[in-house]
Amino acid sequence: MALEKEEKSQIINNYQLHETDTGSPEVQVALLTERINQLIEHLRVHIHDHHSRRGLLKLVGRRRRLLNYLQSKDRERYRKVINSLGLRR
């Protein structure tokens, strides 16, 4: 379920704020979104994998907390991330 190194570096390059940025909320949300999408595909095939379902719920909660933080600090960056990732809210 982990992201490939190339996928991860590509996502970081797309959402980083400066050259050495790897931990900004935008980057973290983008990485979590990709992991969530992979888990959703896994669960479509393996319907009864409840351990992975719990992990998915934890990732969604972590992403929600990061988005709440970003929304409270900078609403414009929040909207940009939501629109670029195609998330509802």
From Swiss-Prot:
Domain of life: Bacteria
One GO CC term on file: cytosolic small ribosomal subunit
Record key words, sorted: Ribonucleoprotein, Ribosomal protein, RNA-binding, rRNA-binding
Region (Disordered): 1-22
Gene3D superfamilies: 6.10.250.3130, S15/NS1, RNA-binding
Entries under Pfam families matching the protein: Ribosomal_S15
PROSITE patterns linked to this entry: RIBOSOMAL_S15
Amino acid composition bias (Polar residues), ranges on this chain: 10-22
Signal peptide positions on this chain: none
CDD domains registered for this protein in UniProt: Ribosomal_S15p_S13e
Gene Ontology BP annotations: translation
Keyword RNA-binding: yes
GO molecular function: rRNA binding; structural constituent of ribosome
Assigned protein family: Belongs to the universal ribosomal protein uS15 family.
Subunit and partners: Part of the 30S ribosomal subunit. Forms a bridge to the 50S subunit in the 70S ribosome, contacting the 23S rRNA.
Primary role: One of the primary rRNA binding proteins, it binds directly to 16S rRNA where it helps nucleate assembly of the platform of the 30S subunit by binding and bridging several RNA helices of the 16S rRNA. Forms an intersubunit bridge (bridge B4) with the 23S rRNA of the 50S subunit in the ribosome.
PANTHER family the UniProt entry points to: RIBOSOMAL PROTEIN S15, BACTERIAL AND ORGANELLAR, SMALL RIBOSOMAL SUBUNIT PROTEIN US15M
Protein name: Small ribosomal subunit protein uS15
Organism: Chloroflexus aggregans (strain MD-66 / DSM 9485)
Lineage: Bacteria, Bacillati, Chloroflexota, Chloroflexia, Chloroflexales
